[in-house]
Each structure stands twice: as C-alpha cells, then as structure tokens.
Amino acid sequence: PCYNEALTIGKVIDDFHRELPGAIVYVYDNNSSDDTSQIAKQHGATVRHEPRQGKGNVCRQMFRDIDAECYLMVDGDDTYPAEAAKSLCNPILNGEADMTVGDRLSNGTYAEENKRAFHGFGNNLVRAMIKWIYGYSFDDVMTGYRAMSKPFVKTFPVLSEGFQIETELSIHAVDHRWRIKDVPVEYRDRPAGSVSKLNTVSDGIKVIAMIGTLFKDYRPLKFFSLIALIFAIVGLALGLP
C-alpha cells in the first residue's frame, strides 16, 4: 500500500527484488499526488490503483486481486528491512504459520528510531486490550510488516477502511485460531522529507473503536455480559440511599 511515497518507493522495490528475486512486487497506489506510480513502474513493480482512500480499502482490494502462496505486506516508506523478508515468508511457505508478524518492539529499535509522540504508548494499549479480550499477547500488534498464507488472506473479511487494518488482521488471526509467529525485525525511522500519514489521535480512536466492534462481533457473550455488569453496578449505586 502506498500514498505519496515517491521519495522511498524506488529503494523499497529494489531492496525486495534483491531479497526475493522470484517474487512479484505489487504497488497499490492510493491516490498519490506525487510520482509514486511512475517511480514504482520504473523500478519494475506491478502498479495498481485503489481510488477509495485508506489502507484498509487498499488491503481489501489487494487480497481480492492477488493469488499467491505467500503474501508479504510492507509499507512503502522504507522503515522495514527487506533483509527480514525470508524470515517472514519461510514459516508461511513451510506450513509452520498462517501469519508472521514483523516485531519492531522486542529489540528496542522502534523506541530508538520512532520520533512520533504516543505511538509506542498506543501500541502497548492496543496489545493490552487484545490480551485482555482474547488472551493472546502480541509482541507488536501495529506493525505493517507481515506475511500471510493464502487460506488466511482469502478468508479474511476486511472491515477496516484505514489504519485499523493491522489491528483487524491481528484480532482475526487470534479469534480464528490461525497460527501466528512473531519475527523480530530492525526498524528505522522515515528518511528526511518523508511524512507519516498516520494521525496519532484520530487514527488511534478509530483503532480502539475497531477493537470494540470486533469484540462485540467475535465475543458477543463476553461483550454484552460486561455491558450488563456495568449497568448493574451503576443501577445498584444509584439505588443505594
């Protein structure tokens, strides 16, 4: 998925062609106003366009369009190392996992490199919520670097429109008991001149809302029992003299 990544997309494509010479590199341009598409074509990528704005919309179309044994998804901002591609893909191709997750947190590189306020806090909050609801602890739930099997991709109903997609992928994997493997990867911040499209506050609220929606859909008994308990406590409190 790409939106205005002309500064970095050429290097990203070259790096992944080098590490995975037999792979087809797709770039889904999400209404870029710069030269992202032209540069991607010049570097040998297959370029497609998604007019509906938002990373979730892009992923929905990608998963519909592409047939592959292994799907490696990465952002076009050159923050994820192509050198980790085989470590992510091999467990999928060897039948050991259905989704591998590029973990930026365990080795400390995300904390060192990321300069945007509250991103680490938001990641930890979402991890804690997923662990409490679903009982599974991800090392890095918000990473955009993942590999997935064909059965996983083709049975995943994408509901998200935007940056909630990583959270939705994670919850879907846990709820449907897909095999998950965390793979530590090095993280590097965006190069000078490259701008993040993520809005910490508004996108963070959307992620939390998505967790609530999926909690209701995937764990309705637990969700409505919790709501009933809250109302019961409030009712008792209001009824006490």
Regions picked out by a protein language model, each given a short descriptive name:
Residues 5-18:
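Short, well-formed alpha-helical segments that are part of the catalytic scaffolds
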Residues 5-8, 32, 55, 81:
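Donor nucleotide-sugar binding loop of glycosyltransferases
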Residues 21, 43-44:
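Short, structured coil segments at secondary-structure junctions
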Residues 29-37:
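A conserved acidic beta->alpha catalytic loop
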Residues 51-65, 70, 82-163, 190-205:
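Acceptor/aglycone-binding surface of glycosyltransferases and processive sugar-polymer synthases
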Residues 158-241:
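Hydrophobic helical membrane-anchoring modules
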